[in-house]
């Protein structure tokens, strides 16, 4: 094959040399109509939320209580029923969120992050490792499920370090995806009709086949096959475009982020995604600002779950919601709350036995030690740490059996939080 033939093939495929193909030929089996594992959505409440304003409420006995954890009263704390362990603070839209979803929630309180640093806490809660140099769980899951998936790991922020085990995709503009997926669309008009486009594709494929068959060198044949596979990425983006809902019907950015990830999963392109919402670093005017951030979070989660239910994916999507750390059990001089190492997180969706709470804190928001087998408070037990949560996550998805787990060990055994 001479240089002219190679350039002809490059033109036929629409790919420039020096670029990695979107999908290698070895990954075709990974592009099934349905990915075997549930879609994992990691939702990050950026800035450090206050669990006592949400899922681990601490009220004051009366208005004369000195140095209260919160301004609301103990008797204002809400619960869905006398038999439910789930309780929530009387702030913002907490009532609507918990009443709608308490039976699906697994809340984990009293998690000791051992840090007040934003980046360290975010890393620990999303990788299970306190020190630097470890990929997020979402990246490890994607590497196991299909590292060559075109949009395998979508990220909108939070801890999205991959350590090179899998690419990550930031979807900054869905308009670009639509233009690549539907290059013949010009507004509402077709530049080429479907029959014309189909005939062009047929001639292009026939010509590509002739050029490929004329090449005998195995290395160049493999390169041509990769180019052909890269060109097929346009069809996969078209699938995503077809599965995307009208994003204008979502009232929150978080809801839109979740809808895009769900569309990617339904298209067989996405295994995991980072979603994010901010506003939780409330060093001043804590009650008002924390309530506003929690409203944004809970509204977005309700939109995401509505999308999950719309597609019948209740047992195919697992959502984990966490933050950087918690906030102090007292107000500062600016009526705000500062950083605190004890926090909470929760799960919703596939494989979660709901209406449950694991872990606890005392009235000073200090983590209580647990028996790691029964998960009940035990003075002789251990404090719950993010590494315990991630050991359970790895076991839940089978990541603990993947070689990456040996390369990035957690040095702790799994605990039965999903059992």
What are these model-derived regions, one by one?
Residues 1-419:
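Ligand-binding pockets and gating/stacking loops
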